[in-house]
Amino acid sequence: MGLFMKSYMKFSPISLAIFSAFSTQVLAEEMNSETLAPIVVTAAGTSQDLKDAPASISIVNQEQLKQHPANRLEEALQDIPGVNVSGSNVNKSDISIRGLPADYTLIMVDGRRQNTRESRPNGNGGFEGAFIPPLNAIERIEVVRGPMSSLYGSDAMGGVVNIITKNVTKAWTGSASVGFTAHDKSTFGNGHHGNFFVSGPLVQDKLDLQVYGGADYRPEDDIIGGSNRNKNRNINAKLSFTPTDKQTFILEGGRHLLEKYETPGKSLALTTTRGTSVAQNQPSSTRASRNHWSLTHQADWDVMSSELSLYQEKAKREVTTNGVMDSRKPEITNTVFDAKFMLPVANHFFVFGGQYQNAKLEDDSVIKVNRVTRTVNGRTQTRSVPIYQNTENKVHQYAFFVEDEINFSDKFLLTLGTRLDHHQKFGTHWNPRAYAVYHINDNFSVKGGIAKAFRAPSIRELSESYVTATEAGAGVIYGNPNLKPETSVNEEVSVVYHHDSGANATVTLFNTDFKNKLTSHYTGNPDPLTGAKLYEYSNVGRANIKGVEVSSHIPFNEHWNVDLSYTYQHSKRKSDEDISASGVSLRGLPLDNTPKHSASGKLNWIVNDSLSAYTRVAYKGKQIWANPRNGDNRNTYRTRGGYTTVDFGTTYKFNPNVSLNFAVLNIGNEIGERVDTNGGSWTVEDGRRFWTNLNITF
């Protein structure tokens, strides 16, 4: 670990960031007001003080969420160090943590995992981040940066995002908000949104009800690479039954529906070029739905506590092209049973339990590819049309886990844990971790640990019976039952400063060695069944990711404070088998969508009890995007230059129940480079826009 730390200190910008972060102590000593220690639940599977959490964890509270549009997860987490927005364009945006793609981040709502990506083959971004509760229902969002496979298993390789919703209330209460976004340029679509939250007792102290929902709409941009037309709606209901003071049953159900529309000549280019072939694009829409239900039992048995949950999500994707609905309608059904127990014994606190998962995928598989020739505007075009046949596949897995938080003293805590996952296809996998927290004094702490993580291949990737079309039907990808789980070994160490005034700073160094990375590559041969270009999945990828994350909150006085965030990330591909569209090895290049430098700073001004304002500056560095089916044969990869945006916002409270938000976002009208599908930028930023939002509580 010593050599690991020394390798970072040679970077002078990082040394400066560390020095700046801990200068908060000088200002904090002048502040006398005390703040309550934040409580988190994700790092250890149970409630604990943030300063004792065995992980690098950040919190976004509701007050922070309300200061800017946050209809998507990417918007809500924009200032968290180590978190970056990824995706092939703005319509397929997603989040990545510490350089790993979105598939490696586990998204949970109230501790229940959700993952509907299998319902969206050929690109699953742009949807998962929209399947979140409306803002008025969210209490806070906890973000764990780094692997949590020892507690949560597969998908938690990069980190965990846990959205904590508000508890049911013992008295009737509620809130509602409506908002509007107006762009400075007519090429961008103006959007509006609204959501509500209602909670209260049906039978006092026994039966409580909570209902919340929301909707947002944005018309299509008139710029290539801009936003599609979006319609997003959701509704959720929760019943809480408390037969005794120590037992609670919670029944919950909801539905989420997201529709996207793209038109050639607007957000979609008129044509798509692949090699020497030029195809006319068609108007299309995508309808993605997610239905879910859960039943949870929480109990305090005096000597221990428990939580049992049975939940299911069902997601489907439907595509309509040029007015004709595609017969292919992929549907994934995930059913999960969770059991978790918390047991204190002397200076030990045990969290242990198990999990059973069953996934059923219904989708069409390619059985052949027809070549269709037609004449458009006097020009002959030939395109591939895949022919599908419906297939069903199921995969189940079970797991057992245990973690022991050992409290050696008020100063030193050590967490040891492991999880055994048994997958139907690839057998048993162990994921241990060790994490230590040492409080040097009342203000300074050092924490760090080492963990092993894994990600199981998806059903399509594992199953020989699924053949997925790619390159608009010009290629096919076969599943491979011999795939291994992707694995990583992760190390991190943090120095943390916190003060009773609310001042805090954290500097984290991390290192990830990643192997068995799953990639699909062109074999150089045609598929004997369909005649299309043959791709296959294999475990060939290796990579290393290391970096520094800095965050700080500095209160100058009761009226002024500042939030700072900086991330340095150095990722490197280490496999010759990872190749570009032109057949050139990508070894030595950074991972996709991972800027080396990113930073944000927000100056907050609390004028009085009614009025507050902020100014935010954010920078994102240069990024690359490279894979076997991106760009053309002339380019090894595509690049997107760095850029800076500036926002200004204000909140005015008319009274304790009514408030108004107003913000000017991207004041400098930075929209990024022109989209260039042949080797340059792949998306545009929203330009200058004006946002207003009215909040009412009752």
Regions found by a protein language model. Name each.
Residues 73-76, 93-96, 108-110, 128-131, ...:
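N-terminal periplasmic accessory domains that precede
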Residues 74-116, 139:
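Extracytoplasmic beta-strand/coil segments of soluble accessory domains associated
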Residues 96, 113-145:
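Short acidic/polar hinge/loop motifs at secondary-structure boundaries
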Residues 169-288, 516:
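Periplasmic-side early beta-strands and strand-to-turn transitions of outer-membrane beta-barrels
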Residues 177, 407-413, 510-513, 532-629, ...:
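Gram-negative outer-membrane beta-barrel transporters
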Residues 244, 252-253, 355, 383-384, ...:
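Structural signature of Gram-negative outer-membrane beta-barrels, strongest in the C-terminal barrel
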Residues 334-342, 388-393, 399-401, 480-484, ...:
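Outer membrane beta-barrel strand-and-loop segments of large Gram-negative receptors
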Residues 515, 619-629, 651-698:
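C-terminal beta-signal and adjacent terminal beta-strands/loops
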